Amino acid sequence: MKLTSLLLLLCATAPSAWGWSNHTVGSYLALQDLPALRDAPQVEVEPLERFLTEQYPAVLALLEQQESFAREHFAQYPPRPDNLKLPAVPSDNLRHDFLTALRINPEIYLAMVIQPLPGKDLPEREHLQANQVMVEQTLSPWNRQRFIVVAEHEKVAPLAVLASAADEPDYGHDINLFSDNPGEVGALYGFGPQPFGDARFQYSSQAPFHMGFFHESAVVYAAAGFLERSWPDWRAYQYMGLARLAFASGHPYWGYRFLGWGLHHIQDLTQPYHAKPLPGVDLASLLLLEGKAIAGFAEDKQASIERVATRHMEVEKYQSTWLRRVLRTGQPHPMLDAYADVAQDKSYPPYSVDYLREVVSAEAVNDSAAFDEAIGQWLETAPVSSDFSSGNQLQREDFDHPALNQQ
């Protein structure tokens, strides 16, 4: 069916598999006034290996319970190959065994760092470069993160750990996990071929773990079954379970860090372009677009593809640039207040394993048409992003401290 080609192109031309350009900034703003975080004691930094060593039997049991549940509960879930199970006796490479049991990219750095809010950096502290924190495929000219090194046994604020960790899954967790991706693990993990994403860009291999099209019609799924092969809700389930275990067993640093990883996937599905392939276009219009293309009039189809790709990219660029600049001025702003607004929180149901599918993505889909229209109206009058010169080269950003500008 030709509708398949249109939907495949829409997913392939998504400009990025990131839901938001920097999850840390929004997480700070949304969570900083919550008493459970604001009043929580500082936590001690510890390497992953310490948590795994001290809690190995519990981690092994949890991962087996999660695998059994996933096979029964998550649609289109590809079972984990049995040889990836954590060994009964810990090996000499705990980290590798743990990451492969989770079916995460084993090449991620898991650097012990925190991100500060823009304008609140600590220039006297040691910083890491982006390529020391993020795998190569996720590096981008748009990377603006500042990474402050934290040492083992150092005490840090829970909010800093949680907000910083909320950005981490974009540092390579889900890169090259499919059988047709470069590298070795794709042939081992059992996910099969990459269902959607643009193969020209290696970072797009993370898309099926960061996007979820859960509310399409039966006609769309019949024409494009690949849309059902995405697992952001499963990833969040894994990480939330690990967070509960870490908190319960006296490892709050990893509790907050795993919690941030899970929060990342929830935030991804608040992005309408991650929950709806073509916002604002109903099924009849979608079929009309494809019918006209079949008849030789493909201009409207191509325009729709370019429109959604442009709006997706521009809203993420704007969100990142705007937040960075507003925070560096230190001035109040209604949009900043909106991040911390909890007035509607009690109207939402309790969190559950299906929350991403039934609540988060459903709300994003319901709002997607109006959101897309608003972005379109803004782009009609918006100036070219000042992050770019007329030669389409990213301009250097100066930070508040000379020491940072030398990095």
Map each language-model feature to its residues.
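N-terminal signal peptide c-region/cleavage motif recognized by signal peptidases
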Residues: C11-S16
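Sec-dependent signal peptide recognition
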Residues: M1-L9
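N-terminal, motif-rich segments that launch catalysis or mediate targeting to/interaction with membranes
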Residues: A17-L245, A275-Q407
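Active-site beta-strand/loop microenvironment that shapes enzyme catalytic pockets
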Residues: A246-G280
